[in-house]
Amino acid sequence: MVAFSTISGLGALSLLFSIIESVDGVSLKVSTDGGNSSSPLLYGFMFEDINHSGDGGIYGQMIQNNGLQGSSPNLTAWASVGDGTISVDTTNPLTAAIPNSLKLDIKPDATGAVGFTNEGYWGIPVDGTEFQNSFWMKGDFSGEITVRLVGNETGTEYGSTTFNQSSSSDDYTKVSVKFPTTKAPDGNVLYELTVDGESAQGSSLSFTLFELFAQTYKSRSNGLKPQLADALESVKGSFLRFPGGNNLEGNDVETRWKWNETIGPLENRPGHQGTWGYFNTDGLGLDEYLYWCEDMNLTPVLGVWAGFALESGGNTPITGDALTPYIEDVLNELEYVLGDPSTTYGKLRASYGREEPWNVTLVEIGNEDNLGGGCESYAERFTAFYNAIHDAYPDLTLIASTDNASCLPSPLPEGAWVDYHNYNTPDELVKQFGMFDNVDRSVPYFIGEYSRWEIPWPNMQGSVAEAVFMIGLERNSDVVKMAAYAPLLQLVNSTQWTPDLISFTQNPNMVIDSTSYYVQQMFSVNRGDTIKEVTSDSAFGPVYWVASSSGSSYYVKLANYGADTQEVSVSIPGMSSGKLTVLADSDPEAYNSDTQTLVTPSESNVQASNGQFSFTLPAWSVAVLTAN
């Protein structure tokens, strides 16, 4: 990610600082007394596998179509090398979950290297760390195998290993190797596996369930890619909602996200057809999500299936007694997550290496059940799941998947939260600045998904509008408990939804921090625990603000949703110095992409005169003043 820069004087963004007694423009006075408690979970993440954000994205495994899974297995991403042919073999299952393999038929007169390549997910990022590769093979073979990472166009080798291996036609043998790499200049790299054709003439070998990992985040087995994980860690979010989203619901009952098919050894995970146009391996499964939360200090928000698929697919919604097995499935999932190792599913979790229960306190029942024909039945379905879960786990906080009162039971059970999703235009986001000012404080809100939408990349106008909306949320963070921008990640080469918070390609160092990413980072990193009263002679618009404190530190967040600069003074009694972080561009259409980085935040140290900070807020800008 791009680090903040420190400037003085005019600087890169033409920031003007002066110490004066008064200014014309927006004058704010922050109270140092009292205030409302602010949710400690306010800023966080929503994740589902969209835009290859999981497979091919933050999930560290790099071989595409690695288990030849799905209802129509094919050779996507695979190609033959030398005197051999490859095909999908459906007759040599590794397990019930991995029924197919890649068959290599070596010609009777073969010479030279014979094998196959895999192109990864639109490339393979070779970062210079040690790589780990494993696969399963079957067939009568004894000899050398060579694994290489090689430039697709250049032929340059970035890592390789040659080793002796034997296998038989009786059963599969698992092969695991490690090898050093040198950093590749781009992601146009192939994984290549070959044998000596002359010594293996006429052989037929089957291979399946390939795994290729570089160094992972926190060195977790089957873990995350560090570059993307580090970008998220830098936001200092407080929660992770998973596994969706539409991908939780599925297109029908069969393709819903099935928690019990995402746990344990990879050879026992069949994967499922995702809702965003591609197959999900589920290598990033329930435990991996929870390790992600643990390693990044995030509170899990576990979504559970609630009897409804997208657009009422697959004879859903399911109601009445027909819901019983699905309620039992959720209770089994929660026992797996929360149960003591003496319980059936707690014991299963322990057998997979996690003895202690996971720290899960928030569970969301369904996803967007107000849409696609789910509303009419949701009150019944929510109540059935709520009662069963609450009876078994009374300390869990349960979240409804909508705030639409016509879809919810009346009254809503005490302690339940509601979820509001908001994809909108910039102007509409700004109009919603005060939408939570007068809501019922007895019903907490989760803003599970929001962003400006329908443009290729986040731009300054949209990001400032999001900041205005977020300021409105933070002002009401006694009742708004959590909020997450969505979607979170995007592989530029395979995209189903834009804009996205963080985009990436497989080229090294190609993590694209958007303007919206910087807004999220600025707001999340600079958080108080108490929202302070701010008085002003000015009305909100085009400048919007919120102030908070934590101990002796104060945070004032501002957004200028307009083309004119604004003179601002902020008075905080007792404060003498601070730091001003500003994200701005005079062009509201300015954006960062895979070909340009136009907008990054700048920081400057500022001094106060008698507790008053004065500065110029640029056009189309978001700013955070931190004072102490």
Curated annotation (Swiss-Prot):
Signal peptide: 1-25
Enzyme class: hydrolase
Xref: SMART domains: Alpha-L-AF_C
GO CC annotation, single: extracellular region
Enzyme Commission (EC) number: 3.2.1.55
Reaction catalyzed: Hydrolysis of terminal non-reducing alpha-L-arabinofuranoside residues in alpha-L-arabinosides
Pathway given in the UniProt record: Glycan metabolism; L-arabinan degradation
The keyword S-adenosyl-L-methionine is annotated on this UniProt entry: no
InterPro entries: Alpha-L-AF_C, ASD1_cat, Glyco_hydro_b, Glycoside_hydrolase_SF, Glycosyl_Hydrolase_51
Record Pfam families: Alpha-L-AF_C (PF06964), ASD1_dom (PF22848)
GO biological process: arabinan catabolic process; arabinose metabolic process; L-arabinose metabolic process
Protein name: Probable alpha-L-arabinofuranosidase A
Chain's gene name: abfA
